[in-house]
Amino acid sequence: MGRIIGIDLGTTNSCVAVLDGDKPRVIENAEGDRTTPSIIAYTNDGETLVGQSAKRQAVTNPENTLFAIKRLIGRRFQDKEVQRDIDIMPFKIVGADNGDAWVEAKGEKMAPPQVSAEVLKKMKKTAEDYLGEEVTGAVITVPAYFNDSQRQATKDAGRIAGLEVKRIINEPTAAALAYGMDKKQGDNVVAVYDLGGGTFDISIIEIDEVDGEHTFEVLATNGDTHLGGEDFDNRVINYLVEEFKKDQGIDLRKDPLAMQRLKEAGEKAKIELSSSQQTEVNLPYITADATGPKHLAIKLTRAKLESLVEDLVKNSLNPLKQALADSDLSVGDINDIILVGGQTRMPLVQKYVTEFFGKEPRKDVNPDEAVAVGAAIQGGVLSGDVKDVLLLDVTPLSLGIETMGGVMTALIEKNTTIPTKKSQTFSTAEDNQSAVTVHVLQGERKQSSGNKSLGQFNLEGIRPAARGVPQIEVTFDLDADGILHVSAKDKDTGKEQKITIKASSGLSDEEVEKMVADAEANKEADKKFEELIQARNQADGMVHATRKQLEEVGDALSAEDKAPIEEALSALETAVKGEDKAEIEAKTQELIQASSKLMEAAQAQQAAAGGAEGAEQQASSGQANDDVVDAEFEEVKDDDKK
């Protein structure tokens, strides 16, 4: 068997790895980078650009530069997640004839697998250039919480790229493989927290090592397939748009070119704030009106960024708690925490994860490369080059059929180890019923309509009989890729109907084949600057904390008491935009003094609720010399997030 490469097909970046002897190696692309932006552009001269070259020209070609396609793959156009993205993407998202979400570039409608295939082709070529031989086999990773439709669509993308997809494996599982192969001692329970560009997964995985044999068993998985770095970027972009609108009276959302520049600058600012306390978004000539060109120059502090995205980070807590519950484990049972995905570099994310688990996550796992490395290891297992490794993954969602009364009856429960096969006997609902419709569903709701419809088929030719007499055996066979095969058999006549679930939509084999064919053809100054940034950070934190308190206990104050607070807030927000540290500090103190009645109201409310300790903490958060950012986080610590 030829080499089987491992590909991490990411929302923001992709990565390819291969076994080099018995060690996995991440392969650099033609530009010398170990990861490739998952960006595809279609130019005026008919050229298709992938990766960094596509990213570089995005500002001048926003409508034909496609990114974050993974958020659309295997989704219906009417899905709320898709409708949300339509308003923020510079390119067109359209509905296909079969109801799927497609994209449009250069006037041509394209299926997401067709677009993703361009990234996979670059990964394939990268591997071939390194190995000096043709590569046809691949293990491709997907978010653990991808449903059947999304997994099928990913396999389709592989086929279109000219790859035989040997296995689809879950990203957290792949990361655990990369982490666990060099851990030689005993047993370990790890939590893989995977926050990437477009998706979030949490998996609890038990790694057993006995006499050199490794078993990786997924105990539970959970997540959100529409939560990731792109959402963090969008919060930054929206903030910049609103600030510019307040300053200049111009809405940049109507200008695709400006929005593309903002996207690039917003992402860069977010990344910079992981290692610095302040950055400035400076975009000259962002737009123009009758008075002439307009320039965008907005300072962004880490405290402000964190206030913008705090709820997103919290949103990962519930899946985390659910995964622990499903695995019958407590936080104390987790030996190690692995962070995967570029967004986990954000200090706020690391803070929440550390507080939740009560321990620091590991720092020896590369969040950008671990998934591809794990996929390459699995490729080695499949090709026979890696021995003594057993991978036991699970299905993320329950699978079942619709039964009488619109109820979903599950045949395969969530977190069942795959592959698996389950059968159950059903009967007719009416007398002399000659046919039954098998409606296949995926999800956790008892009401059928609350779940994802994967498809349906009919079993006909049932002999006339009273209701409840015929015996129809329905079998669900879930393969190692997490893809479902369903059969229904009449035990009386022996008649049987089988299908491989292709979702109620998706690409037909003919469409995939056509796409396959198409794809072929200086010290003081520094000290002063640091002090200025510190003052800005403190001011931003104070503004955020005060506004939060106004929302929570503002009703307890009269309009006369609120007015000076709002006035002080406005004055401080204006001062923060300037370069005068003394002015910022003075306005911060004025806000603290103006907010005294607000603090008293908050203390009174907490005391009434029996929260003396909380009231003490709340009072301390208004002190000028406190680290305002920390105090702000202490306020929400009970809710903490991931």
Swiss-Prot record:
Phosphothreonine modified-residue sites: 199
Biased composition (Acidic residues): 627-642
Protein induction: By stress conditions e.g. heat shock.
Keyword annotations: ATP-binding, Chaperone, Nucleotide-binding, Phosphoprotein, Stress response
Compositional bias annotation for Low complexity: 605-624
Gene3D superfamilies linked: 1.20.1270.10, 3.30.420.40, Actin, Chain A, domain 4, Substrate Binding Domain Of DNAk, Chain A, domain 1
Record GO terms (molecular function): ATP binding; ATP-dependent protein folding chaperone; unfolded protein binding
Listed Pfam families: HSP70
Annotated SUPFAM superfamilies: Actin-like ATPase domain (SSF53067), Heat shock protein 70kD (HSP70), C-terminal subdomain (SSF100934), Heat shock protein 70kD (HSP70), peptide-binding domain (SSF100920)
Chain segments carrying region Disordered: 605-642
NCBIfam families the UniProt entry points to: PRK00290.1, PRK05183.1, prok_dnaK
HAMAP family: DnaK
Stated family: Belongs to the heat shock protein 70 family.
Described function: Acts as a chaperone.
The protein's name: Chaperone protein DnaK
